[in-house]
Amino acid sequence: DGEEFDWVSGGTDLLANYKWRINTKPHVISLSKIPGIDTVSNLEIGCMARLSSLEGGNVHPMIAEAAGKVASSLIRKSATLGGNLCLDTRCFWYNQSEDWRRSIEWCHKADCGTGSDCRVIPNQNTLCVATYQGDIAPVLMVLGASVHLIGPSGERVMLLSEFYQLDGMKKNVLEKGEFLLK
């Protein structure tokens, strides 16, 4: 994530959040025109690969089955692997309309700067427990998948299991301006 922008691939989750004014940024940068990042093979899946292309693609059967169970067929035709792996965390308290969020006390994720409490686990005041909601990551982790990240500091590769954080606000290890390539 960048401070002033979000990367968008399929947009099925990000754009819905923007509609609710959740974590909006001044700019959205599409990855759709970058050539070759929609590849699907048995060894490599690009970040722009549509989930629908994984259902019947040349991938491990567990990946195909998991992709086929995500949402509806219409969403799978737009949703991408990169978007699914980089979903924002979800919280019953935070992922509501702007008016609803204003009607309750702030939480860690709302970033009001007051040292607020987590609404899910009150009185612990140290950690946001909003959870990751993606469908494909668990299967890829079981298979020992790695992710390739690229950004201003160059490229890096890590196990997908090392990509996520145990914090609802800092959901993954992406640095400013970096994105998941494959």
Question: At which residue positions do the language-model features occur?
Answer:
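C-terminal structural segment of proteins
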Residues: 1-182
